[in-house]
Every structure is written in structure tokens, then in C-alpha cells.
Regions:
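Gly/Pro/Ser/Thr-rich low-complexity, intrinsically disordered segments predominantly at protein N-termini
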Residues: 1-160
Length: 160
């Protein structure tokens, strides 16, 4: 019987994060079965919302649609992306409103650059991001006039 000593492998280097161009991100989104956000070269999968989250977003879209029907403004739900050039960030807010003609990123009719209102329904897993890094990026949009954060666990709406 021969006893062999264990093989010890040299440690491997930490794999660098994959970096993608915006064009690669959009190509990924077109064939993906889930939504992702683009963060300065990284593609980050999004989590789904709770039933309350979806109810609040749906009710908000319905309310905005009725209130804005005779205006030059148009509300959009969470399938409309927003591109924030200064941060190389592409997000899917819960609701957005455009007034006047939409301005599209790279002639893509699914990605706007000129929202006047952005609404996020807060979730425990995303609240810090919605209040922090994402809000910081949204503030660089020249068109943005209002940002609303809606709590789903309590009747609270914050307006910035």
C-alpha cells in the first residue's frame, strides 16, 4: 500500500470583475430572462419586488396616467430604463415621468435620459441604494425635478 501525500496547489489570483460596455449590457438585456442594472461596466441582476411593492407601483402608474392625460407629460412603469451618463449608470426605476419629447440614449426607445419625476418603492434590500448611490446619480440628470421614495411597510412618501 502506497501512501501519497496530498497535492497542494498554489493559490490562484482573485479573478478580476468582468467589465462590459454599455452596448454589451444592452445586448445582454435583450436576451436575458431577468432585468439587470448597469453600473460603470458591471452588470448587476435585479431582485423581484414583493406583492405590496408591485401594488404600489401599479397604483402609482394608474394615478399618474389619469392625472397627466391632458398634459404633455407621460408616465412609464418599471420596464423603461434611465441612462445617467455622468455615472455610467442604467437603472429601471419603479416609475418615471417625461414631459415633452423623450430623449433616448443611443436612439434606443427603451432607455430615456430626460425624466422629470422618478419614483422608487423602497424595499429592505434596496432602500440604502435608493437613498444613497442611486439618488446621487439621479441628481445629476438636468431634467429631474422631483424624486419620490415610497415606503411599502408604512404610509409614507418622501419628496426630494
Amino acid at each position: 500500500m502506497t501512501i501519497q501525500s496530498p497535492t497542494i496547489e498554489a493559490p490562484t489570483a482573485v479573478q478580476p470583475k468582468l467589465r462590459f460596455t454599455p452596448e454589451e449590457y444592452f445586448a445582454h438585456e435583450e436576451r436575458a430572462e431577468y432585468k439587470s442594472e448597469y453600473h460603470n461596466g458591471e452588470i448587476l441582476p435585479m431582485t423581484g419586488g414583493s406583492i405590496n411593492h408591485n401594488r404600489i407601483a401599479r397604483n402609482g402608474l394608474t394615478l399618474l396616467t389619469v392625472q397627466l392625460q391632458d398634459s404633455s407629460c407621460e408616465p412609464f412603469g418599471s420596464d423603461m430604463r434611465i441612462w445617467i451618463a455622468d455615472h455610467q449608470l442604467c437603472t429601471y426605476p419603479d416609475l418615471a415621468v417625461i414631459c415633452g419629447e423623450p430623449l433616448f440614449y443611443a436612439n434606443r426607445n427603451d432607455t430615456i435620459t430626460n425624466p422629470v419625476l422618478i419614483v422608487e418603492v423602497l424595499s429592505p434590500s434596496t432602500e440604502d441604494y435608493d437613498r444613497g448611490r442611486k439618488f446621487q446619480a439621479y441628481r445629476t440628470l438636468p431634467s429631474l425635478q422631483d424624486y419620490l421614495l415610497i415606503q411599502q411597510e408604512a404610509p409614507l412618501v418622501e419628496h426630494f
